[in-house]
A protein has these predicted regions:
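Membrane-interface helix-loop-helix modules in multi-pass inner-membrane proteins
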Residues: 13-42, 92-95, 99-110, 178, ...
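Cytoplasmic/organellar membrane-interface segments at the starts of transmembrane helices
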Residues: 329-334, 384, 388-422
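Hydrophobic transmembrane alpha-helices and their helix-loop junctions in integral membrane proteins
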Residues: 52-62, 67-70, 76-95, 105-358, ...
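Transmembrane helix-loop-helix hairpins at membrane boundaries of multipass inner-membrane proteins
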Residues: 1-74, 149-158, 220
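Hydrophobic H-region at the start of alpha-helical membrane spans
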Residues: 1, 44, 129-133, 242, ...
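Core segments of transmembrane alpha-helices
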Residues: 47, 210, 353-356, 414-418
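Short, membrane-exposed interhelical loops at transmembrane-helix boundaries
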Residues: 23, 358-363, 400-407
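C-terminal TM-helix exit segments that contain a strictly Trp-centered aromatic cap at the helix terminus
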Residues: 3-14, 138-145, 345-348, 422
Length: 422
């Protein structure tokens, strides 16, 4: 699938028009696929990182002696392929169908441990993601069909001249809060709750498929349904700029106070997703490019950080940041990978994450929202504070207890490779 995604990306870069209609239900309503530049980017990221996630998951599941591994791998594969179908969806109906397939296929992964905490997390996961999509996203899609007579999308948007400008912010709100996978406040609580799942699932949720499908869908709606020119002209996304900015900063502050490593990374993810939503809401070409690039850079960086969290659990049964003191020498390569991945998430030049943040800042300046540049800068400081604490504790704090750290090679190798992709 990675080679196919690479060929699709090449076709998109060469402006080749590739589309496939599977079923035509009615005029303007069909199930089919079409290659867009943004979809090609998401498809390539998901399929490429899945290789390392799959290898890592074998090492993790075996190293941790997890039960029901066959079921786990089956749903893991279904989830990734659902994400690819979202990436290449040619219309809103196809997008919605595979958006739901992704939700239902990841539920068994979230509840894999089958204990009370996993079941509770699974109920919250399904209630928020399915509830938001059925109550808000589906009606929003129907509204677009009523307004335009079609569920097809366009690179310039489809709503200009088709909808009363006064109703545009309301329709956008239905889409934004209907796309629960983008994890904007206040519909973000499913993501930290889902951290009870095995670490390969966390990597799938945060880097490869689920949340990336959410922000990809958000960008598609902002650019290919509304259109950045329509948003800039009407100001329909102004409220979203402030909501995304608030989410970005608030979750960064919350992350600082989380001692559980996966919980801290979960709130970090919510913050980083808001960068992408904010880039789309700014409604400039530069900001949109920055948002698309941030999908790539955050995916590589965050999958590395979660790989490290899983490695520490399998190798030393460490889950708390406060328990990392002095263990840097016994797991130096793992903490080096975390350090490199963190530099990219923070946005330290010349790491990949610095380029996406640079384009986002340029986009903020182009849009006239200079205050957003300040939001990005404050967030970067907060990122450094809550991420650099981990390697700092490992290498510079005094060891409080002796722990034997043994990292399986199937965990170590993918972690090191993804760290160098950042």
């Amino acid at each position: 699938s990675s080679w196919g995604a690479f060929n699709i990306m090449s076709s998109a870069l060469n402006n080749q028009n590739i589309n496939l209609e599977i079923v035509k239900i009615a005029e303007g309503i069909s199930i089919g696929f079409e290659i867009t530049p943004l979809g090609a980017i998401f498809g390539l990221v998901a399929s490429f990182l899945w290789i390392f996630a799959a290898i890592y998951s074998v090492g993790y599941m075996r190293g941790n002696n997890e039960k029901n591994q066959t079921r786990f791998y089956a749903f893991y594969a279904i989830a990734v392929h659902a994400a690819l179908c979202i990436a290449y969806a040619g219309d809103l109906l196809t997008l919605f169908i595979f958006y739901e397939v992704l939700t239902f296929s990841t539920y068994p992964l979230v509840t894999h441990k089958q204990n009370e905490m996993a079941q509770k997390a699974g109920r919250l996961y399904m209630s928020i993601l399915v509830g938001s999509s059925v109550i808000l996203l589906l009606p929003a899609i129907i509204w677009v069909w009523v307004a335009t007579g079609s569920l097809e999308m366009s690179q310039n948007g489809v709503l200009d001249g088709k909808i009363d400008v006064a109703y545009a912010p309301l329709l956008l709100a239905m889409f934004v809060f209907g796309i629960g996978k983008a994890a904007l406040m206040p519909i973000h609580k499913w993501l930290p709750a889902a951290m009870v799942a095995p670490t390969p699932v966390s990597a799938l949720l945060h880097a490869v498929a689920v949340v990336k499908a959410g922000v990809f869908t958000m960008l598609i709606v902002l650019t290919n349904v509304f259109g950045i020119d329509f948003l800039a002209k009407t100001g329909a996304s102004e409220w979203l700029i402030w909501l995304a900015s608030f989410t970005l900063l608030a979750t960064s502050i919350i992350a600082i106070y989380k001692d559980d490593l996966k919980a801290r990374l979960a709130y970090s993810t919510i913050s980083q997703l808001s960068y992408i939503t904010l880039g789309g809401a700014l409604a400039t070409s530069m900001a949109t490019q920055g948002a698309a690039l941030h999908i790539i850079t955050h995916a590589a960086g965050k999958i590395t950080l979660f790989f490290v969290a899983g490695a520490l659990y399998v190798g030393a049964k460490i889950t708390k940041i406060s328990d990392l003191n002095g263990h840097g020498k016994s797991a130096s390569l793992i903490f080096l990978a975390f350090f490199i991945g963190s530099l990219s998430i923070i946005g330290v030049p010349p790491m990949a994450g610095s380029w996406s943040k640079f384009f986002l800042m340029l986009g903020a300046a182009d849009s006239g929202y200079e205050v957003v540049i300040g939001v990005f800068c404050i967030s970067t400081i907060l990122n450094a504070f809550y991420l650099m604490e981990i390697p700092a504790r490992a290498f510079f704090f005094k060891k409080e207890r002796e722990v034997s750290v043994k990292i399986p090679k199937l965990i170590l190798i993918p972690t090191l490779i993804t760290s160098f992709l950042t």
